[in-house]
């Protein structure tokens, strides 16, 4: 698949086949996602694959802050990737001071780049994804026993698509681009 084709054809998938994605495929996706750009090559993204049905259901029922669409979507996923990021590195100097006026906000920027790269790498292999950002971070952190220096960037449902979602309407270049 060509890069532009992947960018233009990738969709948020909410209905999945129940067959698991082999670990070998997941590892290839993460290996590709490791090439995502990051602040001073800090590579702060980390990936936690959740395959246990009871854990996924618990996340869906208790950790999506009553957002019913995400609950339904996650319950349909054969696996969930929790993308975390290491804190205190992206946007910082070695002495702990900020390198950018965005301060710690650059961590989420890098996590977002990693999430998009992960999703495009998955799509290349026929694996659909949906990025969710509406969740109870404290509960997920406790449930997955995440290290103290990591925060949850997003929760990505994944699996082989059971449908091909329609392409949403996109804004025109004229609406998006300004020349000065």
Enumerate the language-model features and the residues they cover.
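C-terminal helix-cap and adjacent tail motif
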Residues: 3-12, 89, 153-180
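Solvent-exposed alpha-helices and their adjacent loops that cap or buttress functional pockets
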Residues: 39-42, 73-75, 146-148, 169-170
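Glycine/small-residue-rich phosphate/adenosyl-binding loop
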Residues: 41-111
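A short N-terminal beta-strand-loop micro-motif at the entrance of redox/enzyme domains
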Residues: 13-28
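Small-aliphatic-rich amphipathic alpha-helix that forms the alpha element of a beta-alpha
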Residues: 33, 81, 87, 96-143
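Short, conserved aromatic-histidine micro-motifs
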Residues: 139-159
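Short beta-strand segments
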Residues: 31-32, 36-37, 43-48, 117
């Amino acid at each position: 698949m060509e890069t532009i084709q992947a960018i233009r054809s990738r969709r948020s998938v909410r209905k999945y086949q129940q067959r698991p994605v082999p670990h070998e495929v997941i590892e290839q996706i993460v290996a590709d996602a490791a090439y995502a750009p990051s602040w001073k090559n800090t590579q702060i993204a980390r990936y936690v694959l959740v395959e246990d049905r009871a854990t996924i259901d618990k996340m869906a029922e208790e950790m999506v802050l009553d957002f019913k669409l995400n609950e339904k979507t996650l319950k349909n996923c054969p696996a969930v990737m929790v993308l975390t990021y290491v804190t205190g590195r992206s946007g910082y100097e070695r002495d702990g001071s900020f390198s950018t006026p965005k301060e710690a906000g650059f961590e989420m920027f890098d996590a977002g780049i990693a999430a998009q790269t992960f999703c495009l790498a998955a799509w290349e292999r026929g694996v659909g994804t949906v990025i969710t950002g509406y969740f109870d971070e404290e509960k997920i952190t406790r449930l997955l026993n995440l290290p103290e220096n990591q925060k949850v960037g997003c929760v990505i449902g994944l699996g082989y698509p059971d449908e091909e979602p329609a392409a949403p309407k996109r804004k025109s270049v004229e609406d998006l681009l300004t020349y000065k």
